[in-house]
């Protein structure tokens, strides 16, 4: 009986974790869509182009190998 309760609780926790992750991903998707739909009236085209290029790039990652190469 104790084993069944433990399994049931584990399944509930797993379901909660997955639903929380899905909700977080949905919120992030909505934020990305809102950023894409910004109103750029009155802003120079060159600035708009730079903003869109920046938003299209993936986030930067730290790579320690690049520091090792430049220490000559």
From Swiss-Prot:
It is found in: Secreted. This peptide encapsulated in chitosan nanoparticles shows an improvement of antifungal effects on growth inhibition, viability, and biofilm formation in vitro. The keyword tRNA processing does not apply. Disulfide bonds: none annotated. Residues 25-35, 61-72 form a propeptide. One of its GO terms (biological process) is regulation of blood pressure. Residues 1-24 form the signal peptide. Partially and reversibly loses its structure as temperature increases. One of its GO terms (cellular component) is extracellular region. Expressed by the venom gland. GO terms for molecular function: toxin activity. Shows stability to pH variations. It comes from the Eukaryota. Keywords: Antibiotic, Antimicrobial, Bradykinin receptor impairing toxin, Fungicide, G-protein coupled receptor impairing toxin, Hypotensive agent, Phosphoprotein, Secreted, Signal, Toxin. Belongs to the non-disulfide-bridged peptide (NDBP) superfamily. Potentiates the hypotensive action of bradykinin (BK) in normotensive rats, and induces a vasorelaxant effect in mesenteric artery rings that is induced by endothelium-dependent release of nitric oxide (NO). Does not inhibit angiotensin converting enzyme (ACE). Shows neither hemolytic activity nor cytotoxicity to normal and cancer cells. Shows moderate antimicrobial activity against the fungi Candida albicans and the filamentous fungus Trichophyton rubrum, as well as against the bacteria C.albicans (MIC=128 ug/mL), C.tropicalis (MIC=128 ug/mL) and Aspergillus flavus (MIC=128 ug/mL). This is Hypotensin. It comes from Tityus stigmurus (Brazilian scorpion).
